[in-house]
Structure formats: C-alpha cells, structure tokens
C-alpha cells in the first residue's frame, strides 16, 4: 500500500526544513495568506534537495486572517488570483531546476471549494490553464475533486490526521468544538482507519466513507515534528510506503 504525505509550508513555521525530510509532498504558500518570493524560493530549494514533490498552496487574498476568512468573490476573480499564484510558484520552481507537480488550495478557499461548485470550477480551470498535467488536491469526496475530474485533471483526495470530521465527510469548522484532534493516539488511529479502511468516525459517532490518497500533516502544531516522525514509523510498521 502507498500513501502520499503532505504538509503546508512557507507559512512562517520554524519546522519547515525538518518536515521536508518526513513528507513526500510540499504545499508552498504563494504570498496571498503567507510567504513571499523569498520564502517560496527557499521552500522550493529545500524540497528539491529532499526529493519532495513541489506544490502550490494558493489562497484568498487574506494575510490578516491567514486565509481563513470566508469570501464571496466572482469566479473570474478566483480564477485570476489562483492562476497568478500557481504561475509564480511554477516559475520559481523552473528557475531552480524543479517542476511543480500539484496544487492544493489553502484555508477557507479550500473549505468553500469543497462545497461550492462554481468556486471549485474556477480553481480547477486555473490549474488546467496553467498546466493540464498538474495534480489537483482537494478534500476527499468534495466538489473540488469533481471539478478537477471534469477538466480531465489527475486528482488526489485528501484526508487530515488531526482534524475532526462531520457525518457527511466534511471537516468540522475550526470555530466549533472537535475541530482539532489534540490527542496523538487518536490522530494516529484515525489516520490508519482512513488509509487502511477508507472510513472515518465523525464527532457524532457515525462512520463516513473517505478515499485517502494523501494525508495532510499540519506543521504549525506544538508537537508537529514528533507526530510526523511517529506517523512515518507507524506507516513503516504497517508496510505502508510514503511516496508522492
């Protein structure tokens, strides 16, 4: 069995360099919620050094709230902003001899695109316009995955090690109780259940079906690195290969 392990990088976390030794894919902030041209260059350089797949992590223009504010922008605006961000990272990667492989939206852009078909379409269209060979990463079973498939993109369905799930397979909003899993044992058990058995227990106790093709590790938690190492070790014990 094979699984991709991804992390969001270039967002000001000191653990970026160490995380790049543990993951197979990096989602690099493109300046709209965090990061800038220099952090993008640095992350690309380290990703290439570690053989990690390079991906763009576009966001709403919302540095003040780290891309976590809901917005209602016209689809053409979202298309242009997404194309702008992924195009910038693609150029930076190319200049360093690397290749951008995937795109994963950030924060509220990701969450809204999981449920709003028009928004999802604008993002998928931007990815396709930049490079039809790019992989589009989105929440398992979401509108974003369906939009990517309509454009003929390769999609990658994502699950989260440390996030609570609702009965419909969507994430518990960060503003609500149960959104974040603080207990390491619980996060490990949830991840294995999703990867090995394709299901996750919701905060209300029901099982939701999920397709796990990539697991997101958040690099901004207090114990992020220790958990990442433990998850890698657990995957190795179970014969699960980590690869993009």
UniProtKB/Swiss-Prot annotation:
Its EC number is 3.5.2.9. GO terms for molecular function: 5-oxoprolinase (ATP-hydrolyzing) activity; ATP binding. It catalyses: 5-oxo-L-proline + ATP + 2 H2O = L-glutamate + ADP + phosphate + H(+). The keyword Mitochondrion does not apply. GO terms for biological process: carbohydrate metabolic process. It comes from the Bacteria. It is an enzyme of class 3 (hydrolase). Disulfide bonds: none annotated. Keywords: ATP-binding, Hydrolase, Nucleotide-binding. The keyword Nucleotide-binding applies. InterPro entries: Glyco_hydro/deAcase_b/a-brl (IPR011330), LamB/YcsF/PxpA-like (IPR005501). Forms a complex composed of PxpA, PxpB and PxpC. Catalyzes the cleavage of 5-oxoproline to form L-glutamate coupled to the hydrolysis of ATP to ADP and inorganic phosphate. Belongs to the LamB/PxpA family. This is 5-oxoprolinase subunit A. The gene is pxpA.
């Amino acid at each position: 069995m094979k699984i991709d392990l991804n992390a969001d990088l270039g967002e000001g976390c000191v653990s970026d360099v160490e995380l790049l030794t543990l993951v197979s894919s990096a989602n690099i902030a493109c300046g709209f919620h965090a990061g800038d041209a220099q952090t993008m260059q640095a992350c690309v350089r380290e990703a290439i050094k570690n053989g990690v797949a390079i991906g763009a992590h576009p966001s709403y223009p919302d540095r003040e709230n780290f891309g976590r504010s809901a917005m209602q922008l016209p689809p053409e605006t979202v298309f242009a902003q997404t194309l702008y961000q992924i195009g910038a990272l693609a150029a930076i990667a190319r200049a360093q001899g690397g290749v951008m492989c995937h795109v994963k939206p950030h924060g509220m852009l990701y969450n809204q695109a999981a449920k709003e078909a028009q928004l999802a379409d604008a993002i998928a269209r931007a990815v396709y316009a930049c490079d039809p060979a790019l992989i589009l990463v989105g929440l398992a079973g979401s509108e974003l995955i369906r939009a990517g498939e309509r454009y003929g993109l390769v999609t990658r369905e994502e699950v989260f090690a440390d996030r609570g799930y609702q009965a419909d397979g969507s994430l518990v909003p960060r503003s609500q109780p149960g959104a974040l899993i603080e207990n390491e044992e619980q996060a490990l058990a949830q991840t294995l259940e999703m990867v090995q058995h394709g299901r996750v227990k919701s905060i209300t106790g029901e099982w939701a079906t999920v397709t796990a093709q990539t697991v997101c590790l958040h690099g901004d938690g207090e114990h992020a690195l220790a958990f990442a190492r433990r998850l890698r070790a657990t995957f190795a014990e179970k014969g699960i290969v980590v690869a993009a």
